[in-house]
Amino acid sequence: MRVLGLMSGTSADGVDAVLVELSGSADHPRWSLLRSASLDYPTSTRQLILAVGQGEAKTASSLLNLSETITKIQAAAALQCDPEEQAQLVGCHGQTLWHRPPKRAGTGELQRGASWQMLQAPLLAQLLNRPVIFDFRAADLALGGQGAPLVPKADAALLGRTKGWRALLNLGGIANLTLIPPDAGPDRLQPVRGWDCGPANSLIDLAMEQFSEGEESCDQGGRLAETGHCDEALILRWLAEPYFQLNPPKSTGREVFGRADLTRRLRDMQGQPIANQIATLTAFSAAVVAQDLQQLSNQNHPLPIELVVAGGGSKNLTLMRELNTRCRGLRLRRSDELQLPSQSREAMVFALLAWWHHLGYPGNAPAITGAQHEVVLGVRVNPA
């Protein structure tokens, strides 16, 4: 079956689209990436998405208009990727505006989580004249799960296994980690694991936007960070914060590591040159991942033999060097080396999740999200 996958992440820079051929069994799919495309959000759209994600109050009218704009851009990306309309099914993540993980009240009662991925799915189905699977997080959240990350189980299916534990790190706005068991030995029966480590590009991008007065949306290639010096004492202090001490399952987003969080950290670095501040934020993103991997070792969990990196952050050479330095003993590779294109990977995940929905195959993993049990993810809407 040919499936379109559409993904717009927490960086809110645009939509990635893929056309994938999927066949075989659900747990060991055969796949082929046929085409890919990316479409940037207009600056005004991105700024509005980020503003809502930081908790700024907006009118119902502006949110309604935003949802229609996002949907039309998703459709345009899909048609750019699949102009001949080969796909039989579309998997669309939508644009995350807010993610609230579950938590326990003082009484011990569980408050279920909630997550808002903005999309007018019936409109998208009409514009593309194909069934759309969307709202992938809701079923896991309803079962007490985090609703995130959803990519690890799909990562394991797409990437496959090797002789040792393999780690796949996605560097989007947030850094999330997938641990894939080996293909042989006693650990082959272990479940896939995954969680959100903390900020990857979110704080760096917001800082660049602030320092450049809107002229720059990111540190291209990590060039500015490369010229600065990071504050290791400050990084150690930040690593002691509560979120980084939590054990999985755990998930987070820009509502935690967004503009308010950046303001606090910039206050900690007050008086330092801008290059040093960007260098410190970049090193911090790498240190968060390294600390999580070290905590695995402290819990007697086998360390992965390689760290496969995907997402926009893999283009930040300074961030990649920091990861290489701080994650000692791991072979660092880009997912492109394994025929899993970094830019397209998450869109491929949502194509696979849509296919799994079509097959009636569960897309979540309770060991990762904390849900009560496995469940088929997503809601299907057909063109009228």
Swiss-Prot record:
Q: What is its EC number?
A: 2.7.1.170
Does the UniProt entry include the keyword Nuclease? no
Q: Name one Pfam family in it.
A: AnmK
Q: Give the SUPFAM superfamilies listed for this entry.
A: Actin-like ATPase domain
Keywords of the record, alphabetical order, are: ATP-binding, Carbohydrate metabolism, Kinase, Nucleotide-binding, Transferase
| Superkingdom of the source species | Bacteria
Q: Which InterPro entries match?
A: Anhydro_N_Ac-Mur_kinase, ATPase_NBD
* One GO MF term attached to the UniProt entry: ATP binding
From the UniProt record, list the reaction(s) this protein catalyses: 1,6-anhydro-N-acetyl-beta-muramate + ATP + H2O = N-acetyl-D-muramate 6-phosphate + ADP + H(+)
Residues the entry annotates as binding ATP = G9, T10, S11, A12, D13, G14, V15, D16
Question: Which Gene3D superfamilies did the record assign?
Answer: 3.30.420.40
Keyword Transmembrane helix on entry: no
Q: In which pathway does it act?
A: Amino-sugar metabolism; 1,6-anhydro-N-acetylmuramate degradation; Cell wall biogenesis; peptidoglycan recycling
Which Gene Ontology BP terms does the record give? Answer: 1,6-anhydro-N-acetyl-beta-muramic acid catabolic process; amino sugar metabolic process; peptidoglycan turnover
State its role. Catalyzes the specific phosphorylation of 1,6-anhydro-N-acetylmuramic acid (anhMurNAc) with the simultaneous cleavage of the 1,6-anhydro ring, generating MurNAc-6-P. Is required for the utilization of anhMurNAc either imported from the medium or derived from its own cell wall murein, and thus plays a role in cell wall recycling.
What family does this belong to? Belongs to the anhydro-N-acetylmuramic acid kinase family.
* PANTHER family cross-referenced by the UniProt entry: ANHYDRO-N-ACETYLMURAMIC ACID KINASE
Name the record gives this protein:
Anhydro-N-acetylmuramic acid kinase
Q: Identify the species of origin.
A: Synechococcus sp. (strain CC9311)
